[in-house]
């Protein structure tokens, strides 16, 4: 990844050239007498140092043995469009796989720590994507054997809301659709570009967790590329009507645990699993056979859960065998 090394070199030069690295302020005590300078860090310089640390973490993660064995690639890295790095990580052969999922994570996700951990580790959103790939039992890693292949993109091409923005009540908080709406056109363009550059016509799945599912909903309004959509822990996908999202009703799935208060809210267009007019099919989260129950807001793609198997069946382009018995999508 020569261009990543170039970005690191360029940022090192920016840091070396940046002035002033600190701010000096003259302080005169009341009543006169000797004054003195106080020196404080320059916030812009400190922000640049943090971005260099992030960039180094990204490089270490992608060059790790684990990433090489998983065939991970850096598809997007943008340092200019928002407050944080925006990135997209590929797992598997994105250009040639039969089945491709584009997964958009939600609130508090950043490029690092997030998609990429510290000290060469991998963040949980990428692991969530790869849990789905593993459970699909399709070939996706270099050396995997199988007639059908799969790949996933963990897409963070937007500024996901964080707790600071939410507690301050800004319009970039999770209580506002602003960031999801801003993400929509870029994510739609990514879907379209992936389909156009793919060798053959892939089975393309749009996937999203939490606030990322809302961004997914805005993207679906602007792209016809995805064949299926599956969301989990969703506060709403902008609409529960298939025609609004450009989808067929039997290609829309959603997952919500019984104690996920985010999914219960239906804040952005209604709850896909409980709205009476929803075209989404609700997938089961209860224990079934050897599969365990999912609880809360963040366990949907945990290994061994019923919800993970249901989601992976969507990636395989199969009708899920784990449909909630109260699903409003069952006719």
Regions found by a protein language model. Name each.
Residues 47-51, 62-65, 73-80, 120-128, ...:
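Short linear motifs at secondary-structure transitions and domain/linker junctions
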Residues 92-96, 106-202, 220-331:
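Lipolytic serine-hydrolase domain surface
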Residues 207-216:
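Gly/Ala-rich beta-loop-alpha elbow adjacent to hydrolase catalytic centers
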Residues 1-98:
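Intrinsically disordered, low-complexity charged segments of secreted bacterial virulence
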Residues 82-84, 211, 234:
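Mixed-charge, polar/low-complexity N-terminal
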Residues 10-13, 25, 162, 218, ...:
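Residue-level detector of solvent-exposed, low-hydrophobicity positions
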Residues 20, 29, 38-39, 213, ...:
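Intrinsically disordered, low-complexity regions enriched in small/polar residues
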């Amino acid at each position: 990844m020569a261009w990543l090394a170039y970005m690191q070199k360029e940022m090192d030069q920016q840091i070396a050239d940046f002035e002033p690295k600190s701010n000096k302020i003259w302080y005169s005590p009341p009543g006169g007498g000797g004054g003195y300078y106080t020196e404080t860090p320059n916030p812009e310089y400190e922000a640049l140092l943090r971005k260099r640390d992030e960039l180094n973490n990204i490089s270490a993660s992608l060059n790790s043995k684990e990433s090489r064995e998983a065939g991970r690639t850096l598809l997007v890295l943008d340092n200019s469009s928002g407050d944080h790095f925006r990135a997209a990580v590929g797992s598997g052969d994105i250009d040639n796989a039969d089945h491709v999922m584009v997964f958009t994570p939600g609130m508090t996700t950043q490029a690092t720590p997030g998609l990429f951990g510290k000290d060469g580790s991998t963040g949980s959103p990428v692991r969530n994507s790869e849990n789905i790939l593993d459970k699909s039992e399709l070939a996706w890693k270099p050396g995997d054997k199988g007639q059908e292949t799969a790949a996933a993109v963990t897409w963070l091409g937007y500024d996901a809301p964080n707790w600071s923005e939410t507690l301050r009540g800004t319009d970039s908080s999770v209580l506002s659709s602003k960031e999801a709406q801003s993400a929509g056109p870029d994510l739609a363009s990514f879907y379209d570009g992936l389909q156009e550059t793919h060798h053959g016509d892939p089975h393309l799945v749009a996937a999203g967790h939490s606030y990322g599912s809302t961004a997914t909903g805005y993207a679906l309004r602007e792209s016809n590329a995805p064949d299926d959509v599956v969301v989990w822990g969703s506060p709403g996908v902008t609409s529960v009507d298939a025609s609004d999202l450009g989808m067929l009703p039997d290609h829309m799935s959603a997952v919500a645990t019984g104690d996920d208060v985010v999914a219960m809210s239906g804040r952005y267009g209604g709850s896909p699993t409980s709205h009476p007019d929803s075209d989404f099919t609700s997938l089961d989260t209860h224990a079934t056979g050897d599969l365990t129950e999912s609880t809360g807001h963040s366990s949907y793609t945990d290994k061994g859960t019923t919800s993970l198997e249901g989601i992976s069946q969507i990636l395989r382009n199969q009708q899920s065998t784990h449909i909630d018995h109260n699903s409003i999508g069952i006719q």
